[in-house]
Amino acid sequence: MTKRLKMIGRVKELEILSNACDKKTSQLIAVYGRRRIGKTYLINHMFSEHKKECSFFRFTGSYMLDSSTQKDNFIEAIHDWFKEEPTTSIENWMSAFNFLKRTIQKLQNQNQKIVIFLDEVPWIDKKNNGGFIGALGHFWNEFALNTNNIVLILCGSNSSWIKEKIFEDSSGPLYQRLDIKIHLKPFDLKETKEYLLKEKKFIIDDKTIAETYMIFGGVAKYLSLLDSSKTIAANIDELIFNSDGHLNKEYSEVLKSLFDTKASYYSSIIEILSSKQSGMTQTKIAEALGEKSGSKIKDAMEELSEAGFIVGLSKLHSKINTNYIICDPFVLFYNKWVRAFSKNELISLQKPYFSTIMGTQSYAIWSGFAFEILCLSNIDLYLQTRMTKGLAKNYGYWIFPGNENDSGAQIDFIVEYENSVYDIVECKFYNKEFIISKEYKENILHKIEMFKKYALKGKYDIKLIMLTTYGCEKNSHYNSLNIAQDIDLGSLL
């Protein structure tokens, strides 16, 4: 495909989908990722704007319905799209997919590509009590694979379900059958800027774009709700700090829809992590919950990671001590500033509320941490700016607790490259050029010395990187440090 498909972001994904439709064999595709990031929009856009010649069938699972009712809705969807009625009673999912097969066989143009888009697949038959997966597998293995014109797209927000039931179940009918996996992620900071300026028509600077990202992340649905006739702060008040705001109950609704009966337990884990900005190990989280570090907490951490809510950062040169932090900006913001309010308390809040907290010391401290999360979440943009993308081996954190000879040190963001090169990255969110003081300089030098002494053996080449809002003031302390690169937001964007 030579023509670029116009859409903010998603260029690679659109190319993949377009090429799949051009294949001379049937294709089985899985699209998964966090809720609200635009998975459904991506598929609909592809086949309404760029592959209109395909015959397109869509069915969406419903969160609250049982498998039998969903099966009835599936039959109704076939009728709506293809105008076909079953001639016999459809009692189970196997019969339902056989009806879909016969409907496809009746189509006049047998060479036309037929796209079957099953959205929110994890909701269709959550526990597989109705035999949905077996019937789907039979449909694919016995019918679709033997044609050359079917593109079957399985889509869902519950990434752990998709991986467990589709990717990793060696006894399942779709094991190793997938042709394409698309793990859709939120917009990065650059794509968020493009969306806000081009799609939403905001006229705002890079710092305001970063602040918007630090609250909403690159989640397309959240960004689409912003009104450019209002300030970002006014939008936040209306959407989040309003008891009837569109996003006021979003956090609990997302957890419930993804984790069902486990939502409360998972929320407790997130609440614990939100109180510890430096992060916690799985063992420490279990202790805070009053339980042992076993399979229950392990499974929970994996599911929260798959959902994109938390990330485990490895201590450099260590296979243990994975440190978990909240990496989803909206989840981080909600748990810090919104979760504690009851509905009545939200109603009685002084309005505008968000503007009143923006100037507080508490907000400044939180913003500094949220900016670190922004930087970690946009590691690819960082590496592009450093022109080192193909060389990076690993990134994470490093901590030295201290001993009788040396005081402790912690590096929150460090990138390891080939040939023993290391970026020590200092992330600072500031309202103007960041000023390096004597105390700050000495702290950085101590970190570097401890890293050299306790983390490195043999050759090394350490680069100190400043990543700040507006860059650093070039004072004597700045000049006395060997700063390899002074990166501001404009450089990332």
Identify the residue ranges that each predicted region occupies.
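Conserved catalytic cores of phosphodiester-cleaving nucleases, focusing on short active-site segments
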Residues: I379, I411-N431, I444, L464
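Sensor-1/coupling segment of RecA-like P-loop NTPase cores
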Residues: W123-I124, N128, F132, L136-S171
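Accessory nucleic acid-recognition modules appended to NTPase machines
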Residues: K221-Y222, L226-Q410
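Conserved lysine of the Walker
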Residues: K39
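Domain-level recognition of nuclease-like catalytic cores that cleave nucleotide substrates
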Residues: L456-L493
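Conserved small helical "lid"/interfacial subdomain of P-loop NTPases
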Residues: I180-K207
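Conserved NTP-binding/hydrolysis module of P-loop NTPases
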Residues: C54-T87, F333
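Hydrophobic positions on the alpha1 helix immediately C-terminal to the Walker A/P-loop
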Residues: L42, M46
